[in-house]
């Protein structure tokens, strides 16, 4: 599939009023990487909105034959690694032109992970965060929705940063255990959510 690069699919905010309590944004449509198609998925969209000065809310909407999608069992929720080995929703957030960024993983199991990178796939560490993301999940026969609210104010590299670059992605596991990789923009070659070209959304607040 071609990389998504259309004005109606990529939302760019040029102004943000810190006095506002929320901003609603248009949905961004994710596409499967050409090497990992999944015909059981009809669509996968993400809505990103800002609430208060330092909260980002990610809402992922998957439309699919859920009998053919493996979803991790829901639990108490907590920090966990390797969530991308199964169905998982992801976001990558960078501050302005800085080489470093944060990776956010949200699982339908309610588990989560936040990693800090000093540069492209370098210096990976667990990000220190004062409060876990607030995750909610709803599932039906023909789809799944996951919403996660992240408090950027608890992340030193992103606190009070006016210009953010954001990449959106997801991993969907089918009934046979195969993984398909979904993103807003795919670089050439194999799936790579960390690639700088994937940071297709900009938020100026």
Which role fits each region the language model picked out?
Residues 20-25, 80-87, 95-101, 159-205:
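Acidic/polar low-complexity flexible segments
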Residues 44-50, 131-139:
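Short amphipathic beta-strand and strand-loop transition segments with alternating hydrophobic
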Residues 50-52, 62-66, 95, 110, ...:
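Beta-strand elements of well-folded, non-transmembrane domains
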Residues 78-133:
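Extracellular/luminal beta-rich ligand-recognition
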Residues 140-154:
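Localized edge beta-strand/strand-to-loop motifs within extracellular or lumenal beta-rich domains
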């Amino acid at each position: 599939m071609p990389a998504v690069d259309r004005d109606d699919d990529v939302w760019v905010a040029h102004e943000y009023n810190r006095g506002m309590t929320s901003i609603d944004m248009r949905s961004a449509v994710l596409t499967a990487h050409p090497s990992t198609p999944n015909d059981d998925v009809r669509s996968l969209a993400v809505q990103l909105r800002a609430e208060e000065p330092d909260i980002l809310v990610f809402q992922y909407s998957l439309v699919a034959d859920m009998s053919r999608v493996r979803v991790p069992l829901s639990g108490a929720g907590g920090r966990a690694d390797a969530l991308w080995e199964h169905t998982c929703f992801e976001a990558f957030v960078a501050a302005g032109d800085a080489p470093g960024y944060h990776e956010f993983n949200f699982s339908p199991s309610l588990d989560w992970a936040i990693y800090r990178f000093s540069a492209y796939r370098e210096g990976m560490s667990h990000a220190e965060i004062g409060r876990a993301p607030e995750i909610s999940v709803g599932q039906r026969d023909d789809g799944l929705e996951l919403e996660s609210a992240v408090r950027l104010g608890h992340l030193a590299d992103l606190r009070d940063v006016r210009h953010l670059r954001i990449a959106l992605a997801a991993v969907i596991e089918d009934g046979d255990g195969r993984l398909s990789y979904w993103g807003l923009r795919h670089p050439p070659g194999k799936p790579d959510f960390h690639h700088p070209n994937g940071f297709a959304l900009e938020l100026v607040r």
